[in-house]
Amino acid sequence: MSPSLVAPEPEHCPGPESEQAGQGDACAGCPNQQICASTPKGPDPDIPIIRERLSQVRHKILVLSGKGGVGKSTFSSLLAHAFSANPDSMVGLMDTDITGPSIPKLMGVESETIHVSNAGWSPVWVTDNLGAMSVQFMLPNRDDAVIWRGPKKNGLIKQFLKDVDWGELDYLIIDTPPGTSDEHLSVNSLLKDSGVDGAVVVTTPQEVSLLDVRKEIDFCRKAGIRVLGLVENMSGFVCKNCNTESQIFRATTGGGKRLAKKMGIPFLGAVPLDPRIGMACDYGESFVDGFPDSPAAKAIKQVVRAVGQLVGEDPDTVLPDDTAE
């Protein structure tokens, strides 16, 4: 039971029911500090509910990035579309970027709303085998700002995990905000007993992005999250007329491949820039299905095969290899 607080939670509050309640840096000077510190602590009673709810989800994969603007949410949508290109796979895409939800737009379902049944919240189905969940589906107006502090954001993420009726899924892709914020800590603590397969980290070639990616990888290691590998997004531009590759964002310090080697994690692949990706996202369509022979689509499919293999699946079962054609 939540303690009765005498003042609103401060920014970066760890939450009155968390193990750090009354002890975190944000607690210093808070009127609620003694109340939170004296509240009996114990295991979160919702953890077993979440574990049971997600017991039918075979693989849970986080998508992370150290810096915003590297195409993480776009890549999450591409990953979900590519996994669902196999009609035998059931795929879910959960948007935990509470204050900047973009998944509904990327998937072409931004006008949809959440439906509630006796079984829980129903995800919005993009296709027969691809569902999505986002706070955007709960807003009266798609342009409404979500101005929430940490505890409220964490509460919604908990609801997504324990109340959404995904049913049987082969893959649940969890798109997260940039950096290492409350949302990441919440997802990690709530899923620690549910068997997260690991995280795919997205970067761009420039050192300014790699700098933050190093911090993201360090966060994963400290939090006990397996890093499945690193993807370099916006890696060069291939002209569709002459097939000449140009480096738009130059890898001044060796790019993602060198960083992955230095950090001791797999390098999953490099996805080149393609303006048609942006066009497909604006229209909420699958770039992988629309332009299957493009260098970017082939690179994305190879990343999907690699991720599938890392979580214990046969890559040819995950997605047939068409690069040899």
From Swiss-Prot:
Chief site of localization: cytoplasm
Q: Kindly give the Pfam families that the UniProt entry links to this protein.
A: ParA
List residues binding ATP: 66-73
Q: Which cofactor does it need?
A: [4Fe-4S] cluster
Q: Biological process GO annotation list?
A: iron-sulfur cluster assembly
Location of this chain's protein in the cell:
Cytoplasm
What family classification does the UniProt entry report for this protein?
A: Belongs to the Mrp/NBP35 ATP-binding proteins family. NUBP1/NBP35 subfamily.
Q: What is this protein called?
A: Cytosolic Fe-S cluster assembly factor nbp35
Q: Look up and give the organism this protein is from.
A: Aspergillus oryzae (strain ATCC 42149 / RIB 40)
Its lineage opens with: Eukaryota, Fungi, Dikarya, Ascomycota, Pezizomycotina
